[in-house]
């Protein structure tokens, strides 16, 4: 499969640990409800339709009966159509505690039916991933680049050295906007207003932005 890689300088930081009721944390990652699952594609999945199963409620992220594993090599490409416009603020990628865990994630926006050949182009943002087996690490996006997203593509370009890649959960945090003729409805899928009230580790990883 064709693919390219590019990186910029960056580092990691973990926010202070914060407590939050599970139902509020679940609401924060509620954008999965705004995905058009019937049209969602996962390229190079070993079992057809399994890629849809990793977009699930945050409180079900530890359910290991639902996962996606790559087929021919370590790459996966998710094409995610939303039912409205999204302002994407953060992503969680949860995998196995071994070399099958993704090590790099590349995000593209508004390219429906994206193929692996299309990943030759520059992504909106690239993340170097840490192993996350609990679904607690959030990778913060450059919000100005993801403020009007109707289609998100997530390219898992490599893992930590295994032949295949396995993912149990992908969490998306942000705002969803439904455009109507007479009104605009905005659903804010974020944690509580007071950041000291909930627990989340936020990671600012290596990134690459289009200039």
Swiss-Prot record:
Residues 20-192 form the PITH domain. GO terms for cellular component: cytoplasm; sperm cytoplasmic droplet. One of its GO terms (biological process) is penetration of zona pellucida. Residues 1-20 are annotated as: Disordered. Keywords: Activator, Cytoplasm, Phosphoprotein, Transcription, Transcription regulation. It is found in: Cytoplasm. InterPro entries: Galactose-bd-like_sf, PITH1-like, PITH_dom, PITH_dom_sf. The modification Phosphotyrosine is found at residue 189. It comes from the Eukaryota. Its main location: cytoplasm. PANTHER family: AD039 HT014 THIOREDOXIN FAMILY TRP26 (PTHR12175), PITH DOMAIN-CONTAINING PROTEIN 1 (PTHR12175:SF1). Promotes megakaryocyte differentiation by up-regulating RUNX1 expression. Regulates RUNX1 expression by activating the proximal promoter of the RUNX1 gene and by enhancing the translation activity of an internal ribosome entry site (IRES) element in the RUNX1 gene. Belongs to the PITHD1 family. This is PITH domain-containing protein 1.
């Amino acid at each position: 499969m064709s693919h390219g890689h590019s990186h910029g300088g960056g580092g990691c930081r973990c926010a202070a640990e914060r407590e939050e009721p599970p139902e509020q944390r679940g609401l924060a990652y509620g954008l999965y409800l705004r995905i058009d699952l019937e049209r969602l594609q996962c390229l190079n999945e070993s079992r057809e339709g399994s890629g849809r199963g990793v977009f699930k409620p945050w409180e079900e992220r530890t359910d290991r009966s639902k996962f996606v594993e790559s087929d021919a090599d370590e790459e996966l490409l998710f094409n995610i159509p939303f039912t409205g416009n999204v302002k994407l603020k953060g992503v969680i990628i949860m995998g196995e505690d071994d070399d099958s865990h993704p090590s790099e994630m590349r995000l593209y926006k508004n390219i429906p039916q994206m193929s692996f050949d299309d990943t030759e182009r520059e992504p909106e943002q690239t993340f170097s991933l840490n192993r996350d087996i609990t679904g607690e690490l959030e990778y913060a996006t450059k919000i100005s680049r993801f403020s009007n997203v109707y289609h998100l593509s997530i390219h898992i370009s490599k893992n930590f050295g295994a032949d295949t890649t396995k993912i149990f959960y992908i969490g998306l945090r942000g705002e969803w906007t439904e455009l109507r003729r007479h009104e605009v409805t905005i659903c804010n899928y974020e944690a509580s207003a007071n950041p000291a009230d909930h627990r989340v580790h936020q990671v600012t990883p290596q990134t690459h932005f289009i200039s």
